[in-house]
């Protein structure tokens, strides 16, 4: 599908991660609650909720460590729930990306697709997530 996505990188103090400001042009207007519901159901997106008290990427990495993640890896996009906003057909959000870890799961899925061992992307994602005991934030 053709999706017009614009991302901007910002200079902020971060620890082993980087932040994106994401702006998407949607096909139709969306409600913030519906977008959050979609994010919650996606196996590779996690919501960083205000209730966690997380205000930085360093705290997010520590949270992953507390969850028992190997090397405190964050395989999902850490989307700050309070940043999700919709304006007409535009969606905005901030996401934290652990550049050392987010590519791991995607590469595993890509290898399966390239060699043809799994044709269904959703099934490949589920297999990888299960092998890593990975449940998104």
Regions found by a protein language model. Name each.
Residues 92-137:
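Generic C-terminus detector
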Residues 1-101:
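C-terminal substrate-binding/catalytic lobe of Rossmann-fold NAD(P)-dependent oxidoreductases
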């Amino acid at each position: 599908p053709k999706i017009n996505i614009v991302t901007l990188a910002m200079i902020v103090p971060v620890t082993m991660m980087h932040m994106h400001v994401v702006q998407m042009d949607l096909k139709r207007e969306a409600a913030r609650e519906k977008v959050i519901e979609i994010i919650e159901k996606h196996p590779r997106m996690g919501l960083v909720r205000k209730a966690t008290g997380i205000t930085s990427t360093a705290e997010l990495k520590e949270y992953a460590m507390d969850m028992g993640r190997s090397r405190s890896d964050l395989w999902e996009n850490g989307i700050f729930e309070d940043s999700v906003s919709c304006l007409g057909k535009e969606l905005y959000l901030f996401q934290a990306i652990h550049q050392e870890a987010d590519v791991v799961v995607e590469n595993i899925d890509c290898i399966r697709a390239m060699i043809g061992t799994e044709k269904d992307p959703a099934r490949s994602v589920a297999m990888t997530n299960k092998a890593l005991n990975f449940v998104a934030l």
